């Protein structure tokens, strides 16, 4: 289970990096991250179920392994947030660690609710709304 998660998460991080490579704006990069997260899981139901339900284990060893696998994804979020701060898109005193936790937690919870509702709605269609909430929380003002 962990090796499958590790492989898929590695592919996922690489996909995010490729899709955001030519984008200057942190706000646009964050949209790409959210949309890609939702798109990839909506296209792979078994992976969505595994990531949202099966990997929610209380076993400490398993949790540590999962956290290790997630580091690359969380690093991408940190890079986007730091870019946004440097470019003045996000508030200068933004706590990157807390903002990352907020982004990851929000995206994760939206996918979990989608899985638990038996996919009754279009997950990818929520990208714009979720992104808008996240950038507002990071201090973005148009």
Residue ranges, per PLM feature:
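A general structural signal for well-ordered alpha-helical segments in protein cores
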Residues: 1, 48, 74-77, 100, ...
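C-terminal peripheral helix-coil segments that are non-catalytic and often amphipathic
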Residues: 32, 36-43, 75, 79-87, ...
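Short secondary-structure transition hinges
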Residues: 39-78
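An amphipathic alpha-helix adjacent to DNA-recognition modules
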Residues: 1-17, 31-35, 74
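Secondary-structure edge/capping motif, primarily at the C-terminal ends of alpha-helices
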Residues: 19, 51-55, 114, 118
């Amino acid at each position: 289970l962990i090796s499958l998660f590790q492989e898929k998460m590695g592919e996922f991080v690489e996909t995010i990096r490729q899709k955001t490579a030519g984008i200057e704006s942190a706000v646009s990069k964050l949209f790409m991250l959210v949309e890609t997260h939702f798109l990839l899981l909506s296209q792979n139901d078994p992976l969505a179920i595994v990531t949202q339900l099966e990997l929610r284990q209380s076993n400490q060893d398993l949790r540590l392994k999962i956290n290790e696998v997630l580091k690359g994804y969380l690093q991408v979020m940190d890079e986007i947030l730091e870019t946004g701060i440097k470019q003045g898109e996000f508030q200068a005193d933004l706590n990157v660690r807390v903002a990352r936790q907020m982004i990851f937690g929000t995206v994760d919870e939206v996918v979990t609710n989608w899985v638990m509702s038996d996919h009754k709605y279009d997950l990818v269609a929520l990208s714009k709304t979720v992104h808008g909430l996240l950038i507002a929380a990071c201090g973005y003002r148009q």
